[in-house]
């Protein structure tokens, strides 16, 4: 890949909670049998970025705003669900190897990662709360019912810090967004944790798997 001054790339991965098995229960009387079939539903979401070009963005300069709108959408056949998202920032070279960013002899990698994280949060849409575990939780359940919300945009753009300079020349930064979902109905009382403003800040005792 031809090196550019500054290159921005994004990888988005969607992980979802699952329920996807079918069971058959038979009930018998003295004279006849009755068979009731109960089929479980599923929780399934997609994650895409309609405003971000598939080929990525190149020749980025400090203070440039990049359109980036991670959008979580409930599948049309999915049960209602709560969603959360994680954002991870990394700096890599042209071969995808992790880089350390130095300025004036000081390692500023974590500082610069935090700056990009803050840039994402600066355009975060309403309804999201940063949880105690680093995830961002959407406080409205997604549903395909009439007049319901079936998608949520995490944030709308990222602005590269104006103070950055030659220390990031020929560097790519990657913003990985991961989305997860959990069924909204019939959860145990202790699964969702709320803050003092009644915003979701954690899913306790939940193992997330991909729904195929």
Per-range role (PLM):
Residues 55-58, 134-146:
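Beta-strand-rich interaction surfaces with strong enrichment in secreted/lumenal proteins
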Residues 41-44, 79-94:
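Short acidic, flexible loop segments centered on an aromatic residue
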Residues 45-67:
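Beta-sheet-dominated interaction scaffolds and their linkers
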Residues 41, 92-135:
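A surface/secretory-pathway sequence property marking extracellular, secreted
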Residues 1-49, 70:
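Gram-positive cell-envelope targeting signals
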Residues 50, 88-90, 157-161:
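Generic short beta-strand segments
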Residues 64-83, 141-212:
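C-terminal, structured domain-capping segment
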Residues 29-31, 88, 178-182:
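Beta-strand-rich extracellular modules
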């Amino acid at each position: 890949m031809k090196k550019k001054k500054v290159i921005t790339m994004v990888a988005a991965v969607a992980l979802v909670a699952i329920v996807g098995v079918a069971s058959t229960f038979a009930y018998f009387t003295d004279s006849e049998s009755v068979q009731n079939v109960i089929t479980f539903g599923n929780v399934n979401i997609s994650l895409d970025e309609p405003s971000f070009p598939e080929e990525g963005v190149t020749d980025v300069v400090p203070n440039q705003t990049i359109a980036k709108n991670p959008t979580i959408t409930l599948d049309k056949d999915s049960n209602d669900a709560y969603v959360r998202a994680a954002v991870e920032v990394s700096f890599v070279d042209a071969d995808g190897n992790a880089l350390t960013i130095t300025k004036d002899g000081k390692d500023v990698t974590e500082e610069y990662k935090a700056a990009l994280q803050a840039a994402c949060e600066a355009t975060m849409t309403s309804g999201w709360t940063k949880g105690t575990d680093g995830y961002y939780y959407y406080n409205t359940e997604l549903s395909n019912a009439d007049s319901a919300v079936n998608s949520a945009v995490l944030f709308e753009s990222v602005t590269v810090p104006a103070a950055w300079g030659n220390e990031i020349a020929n560097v790519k930064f990657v913003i990985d967004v991961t989305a997860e979902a959990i069924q909204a109905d019939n959860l145990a009382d202790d699964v969702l944790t709320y803050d003092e403003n009644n915003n979701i800040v954690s899913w306790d005792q939940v193992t997330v798997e991909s729904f195929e």
